[in-house]
Amino acid sequence: MKKLISIFILSLLFINTKADTHYINSGNFYYSPSSLTVDVNDTVVWLNVQGFHNVNFDISSTTGNSFGNPVSFISSPTGADTMYIHKFTVPGYYEYDCSVGSHAASGMIGNITVNAITDGNGVANGTSLT
């Protein structure tokens, strides 16, 4: 039993637990970068460079259909320097836009891929990825 506990504790050392913070600039009709890949537990900060914007991960402003994201959320429109901060805890592919005026129709759209944390053996959250 001691051997199993030791192996378990050692395996925890190899699990990626480091969380990063990523920044997206928001300006007149753009998010930069517009496409981003992060890991589960990473935080994304949207910075407002210019204008009045939000981040909408719920309903597409151009089609009126749900983005179908693993988790849906929307921030309030703001002109503040920091628009929104979100910690991604659910892996998957997320699409979003700015739902202020016609910003999305003018190209203010983006996507984020959230990768599951793996243990180095292709196992994420107890589920084999292979």
Regions found by a protein language model. Give the residues of each.
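Sec-dependent signal peptide recognition
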Residues: K2-I7
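Repetitive helical segments and hydrophobic/amphipathic motifs
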Residues: S11-L12
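Sec/Tat signal peptide C-region and signal peptidase I cleavage site
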Residues: I15-A19
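Extracytoplasmic copper-binding redox domains, predominantly the cupredoxin/blue-copper superfamily
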Residues: D20-D119, N125
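A short beta-strand segment in extracellular, disulfide-stabilized domains
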Residues: G126-T130
